[in-house]
Amino acid sequence: MSNDNTVSWQGPRRIVNLYDTPYEPYDLEGEVQDNIHLLNIGYDRDRATGWYVIRMEPGTASLPHEHAKHEEYLILEGELIESDGTVLKKGDFISYSPGSFHNSRTETGCLLIGHDRDPYAE
């Protein structure tokens, strides 16, 4: 069966597989953090906005940090434990406002996709 609405693809695109692409040491909070890995899938370091994937090894904790922008992420695998004790699991979506201060740790390991953005215009 054909679809008469199909058009041929035009323009650039980038496809990244989260499981096949090498990760880099995580450094979005300034210094490199051991056992935390970053995959830049659309993050603009100059503007500090865009998409990324973070993989945390079991037993790892992030450095305490404050969010300058909105940060949102979705847990894809494992669990993440927030500094207030909240346990985030696969499928949980989290949204932080600018000025939020926390750190996170994982006992199981964790894979998440995140997005940092400027506030929406009102």
Tell me the role of every PLM-derived stretch.
Residues M1-R47:
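A short, N-terminal "cap"/entry segment at the start of jelly-roll beta-barrel domains
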Residues D34, P98-E122:
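Ligand-binding loop in jelly-roll beta-barrel domains
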Residues P58, H67-S83:
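Glycine- and acidic-residue-biased ligand/ion/polar-headgroup-sensing regions
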Residues T49-V53, Y73, C110-L111:
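Structural motif
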Residues H37-H67, S97-F101:
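Conserved short histidine dyad/triad with adjacent acidic residue
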Residues E66-A68, T86-V87, T106-T108:
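Short glycine/proline-enriched turns and hinge-like loops at secondary-structure junctions
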Residues E82-H102:
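Short acidic-glycine-tyrosine-enriched beta hairpin
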